[in-house]
Amino acid sequence: MNQMNPAFVMPDVQSTVDTRQIPIQRVGVKAVRHPLTVCTESGDVQPSVGVWNLDVRLPADQKGTHMSRFVALLEENRAPLTVERFRAMLASMLEKLEAQAGRIEVTFPYFVNKTAPVSGVQSLLDYEVTLAGESRDGHTRVFLKVLVPVTSLCPCSKKISQYGAHNQRSHVTIDAELAGDLPVEALIRIAEEEASCELWGLLKRPDEKFVTERAYENPKFVEDLVRDVAQRLDADERVIAYVLEAENFESIHNHSAYALIERDKRLAA
């Protein structure tokens, strides 16, 4: 069996000087699958699996970063994920990598237990959530992104038809820069409450009747959808800025209807 000579010191190639003198804005690891737990709005802990991207800025005179330290950071942070813990994790990464700037992003499925509107049966519905943070020159920003599936029904179709109206599944994506802790469920509720109707994982016939009639009584263009959600985000002090998108997967076309609103409240102050 090979044994290392105690007098031998392994060279640290990454820390050597690079003579090309070209800085690298972002270098790190991408698409690392790692388990995590998330604190829910009710205080429970939900297990999930995250896909992580972690990177730092590399100075012009440094040959390379220490890739193993990114994965070590994930191993050391097993506590349930919150916005504050995520901020602390970002600061820890910069310290470990001796970097002045860096970014962490994790995307994971998040489940909400929902109760059907009439029958009361319960089922889970999944949402795609991304938590991202970036730190540069001592300033840290944290973003919470949620993709919320909903139902939309066309006002024009309802107006011109003797009966019925075309409707479809839609995606509302809210990417919010946070001023403080904001539960995932809060953004989900905003999107669902402003749609023609929300979705459930399991519905009985009385529930289907409710969903059909609810959407018919609450028709919205894609423009209506983004504007109504934007009003809610504008009124929420926990949101500093946002990029809001809505995509309707049109049931009568082979294309989607799309709208986007972007706002930074700091610029309006």
From Swiss-Prot:
InterPro entries: GTP_cyclohydrolase_FolE2 (IPR022838), GTP_cyclohydrolase_FolE2/MptA (IPR003801). Pathway: Cofactor biosynthesis; 7,8-dihydroneopterin triphosphate biosynthesis; 7,8-dihydroneopterin triphosphate from GTP: step 1/1. The keyword Hydrolase applies. GO terms for molecular function: GTP cyclohydrolase I activity. Keywords: Hydrolase. Converts GTP to 7,8-dihydroneopterin triphosphate. PANTHER family: GTP CYCLOHYDROLASE MPTA. Belongs to the GTP cyclohydrolase IV family. This is GTP cyclohydrolase FolE2. It comes from Burkholderia vietnamiensis (strain G4 / LMG 22486).
